């Protein structure tokens, strides 16, 4: 419950963060399909004997090359099978958290028997779409998710429609907390972070707890491309400096290594993405530790990072050709800059430099290599902060960067929302040809 004296706008900010910053086990695109399959299985009369699934091209892109936690296998078919046979239909993005060894074995057997199919939905106008249909003999149940990773819009069985979401908001119904972000500014977000009671935002410390645990697991060197562990090793060999810059990159990329490599630990996600949550969290945590920040100061920095990342991503399609680790790292740059000197000018300069640096990075699907992009984005964020502290930034005379940070963000998001759609189609075409 909110303090009744809390600024209504601040309440909306907090609700937006609570809506967008959630625990997630496994990459969220295959997990979205696993959730659809789990909910469908819960509606089915009898055990699942066969699974059919259809997904949007973008969801297919982000599900082709990523490891599903606990399985050692990559791709959407194993996600759909395990969701149907071992998923918790009530757990949202943690749908696979209770999957047993037997359920994993059964899912692999179903896959080996050719009883699982995943196809691209055609035609499909949705960026994020997943539909799972499970069968027991002639009986079936089908669940459709559209728009958001857990946004179930339809449940039906052979007996008829069980649930359908209304397409439009009922008159008088409260708007989504995210809607307010289209009418706010970074300056207003900073004022909120500086003045909101600590008790109202203490919950954001959970992002540090979850993502630090994931980072520690990644440093074991067992997961993905083990970038974090490799860089740490090179520090010991004297090939990389043992300093704050290295620590930011090592600990952030290690969390992504574990995430993308299939570790059975949840990430605290941001905007429906574990890697975005990691990128918005870990650089801020490392800098906070360096300066000996207490819990309140860490919470305010994390809130600025996560809310700024949501604010920017809210101007983008849910999935696009733009690697959103870059926009999450813009949030991290804001959080780190706030920890060092707290000035709006430093924060805005750091974000502008980020837009001038990494804005062209493409998303070519979720995979172990995401940790490379996460490490690059984290490094760029700290570099941008260091430049801003010296009163240096990419200016409005250069490229897509404008003299005003809000316009710079709008320019970047326009590029991703419009021109990069063709890039997205080309990426999907290339990846589909590899999968044949």
From Swiss-Prot:
Source organism phylogeny: Bacteria, Pseudomonadati, Pseudomonadota, Gammaproteobacteria, Enterobacterales
Source species, domain of life: Bacteria
Name this polypeptide is given: UPF0597 protein YhaM
InterPro entries reported for this sequence: Ser_deHydtase-like_asu, UPF0597
One MF term in the entry's GO annotations: L-cysteine desulfhydrase activity
Gene name linked to the record: yhaM
Pfam families attached to this UniProt entry: SDH_alpha
Family the entry assigns: Belongs to the UPF0597 family.
PANTHER family the UniProt entry points to: UPF0597 PROTEIN YHAM
GO BP: L-cysteine catabolic process to pyruvate
């Amino acid at each position: 419950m909110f303090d009744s004296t809390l600024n209504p706008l601040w309440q909306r900010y907090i609700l937006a963060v609570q809506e967008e910053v959630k625990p997630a086990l496994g990459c969220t695109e295959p997990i979205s399909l696993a959730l659809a399959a789990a909910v469908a299985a819960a509606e089915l009369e009898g055990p699942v004997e066969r699974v059919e699934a259809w997904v949007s091209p973008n969801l297919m892109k982000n599900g082709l090359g990523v490891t599903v936690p606990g399985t050692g296998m990559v791709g959407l078919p194993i996600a759909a099978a395990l969701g149907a046979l071992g998923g918790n239909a009530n757990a949202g993005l943690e749908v696979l958290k209770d999957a047993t060894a037997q359920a994993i074995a059964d899912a692999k057997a179903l896959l080996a028997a050719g009883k699982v199919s995943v196809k691209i939905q055609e035609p499909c106008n949705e960026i994020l779409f997943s539909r799972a249909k499970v069968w027991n003999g002639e009986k079936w149940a089908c669940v459709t998710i559209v728009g958001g990773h857990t946004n179930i819009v339809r449940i039906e069985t052979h007996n008829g429609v069980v649930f359908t979401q209304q397409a439009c908001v009922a008159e008088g119904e409260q708007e989504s907390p995210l809607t307010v972000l289209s009418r706010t500014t970074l300056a207003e977000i900073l004022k909120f972070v500086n003045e909101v009671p600590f008790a109202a935002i203490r919950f954001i410390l959970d992002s540090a707890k979850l993502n630090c645990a994931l980072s520690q697991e990644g440093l074991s060197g067992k997961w993905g491309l083990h970038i974090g562990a490799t860089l740490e090793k090179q520090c010991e060999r004297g090939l990389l400096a043992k300093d704050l810059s290295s620590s930011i990159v090592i600990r952030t990329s290690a969390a992504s290594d574990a995430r993308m490599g299939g570790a059975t630990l949840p990430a605290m996600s941001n905007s429906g993405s574990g890697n975005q949550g990691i990128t918005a969290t870990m650089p801020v945590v490392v800098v906070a530790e360096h300066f000996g920040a207490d819990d309140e100061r860490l919470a305010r920095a994390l809130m600025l990072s996560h809310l700024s990342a949501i604010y920017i991503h809210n101007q983008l399609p849910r999935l696009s050709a733009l690697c959103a680790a870059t926009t999450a790292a813009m949030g991290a740059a804001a959080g780190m800059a706030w920890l060092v000197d707290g000035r709006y000018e430093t924060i805005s300069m750091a974000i502008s430099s980020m837009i001038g640096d990494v804005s062209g990075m493409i998303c070519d699907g979720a995979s172990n290599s995401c940790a490379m992009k996460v490490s690059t984005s984290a490094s760029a964020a700290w570099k941008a902060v260091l430049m801003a502290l010296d009163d240096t930034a990419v200016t409005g005379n250069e490229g897509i960067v404008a003299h005003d940070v809000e316009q710079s963000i709008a320019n970047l998001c326009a590029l991703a929302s419009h021109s990069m759609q063709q890039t997205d189609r080309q990426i999907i075409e290339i990846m589909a040809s590899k999968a044949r």
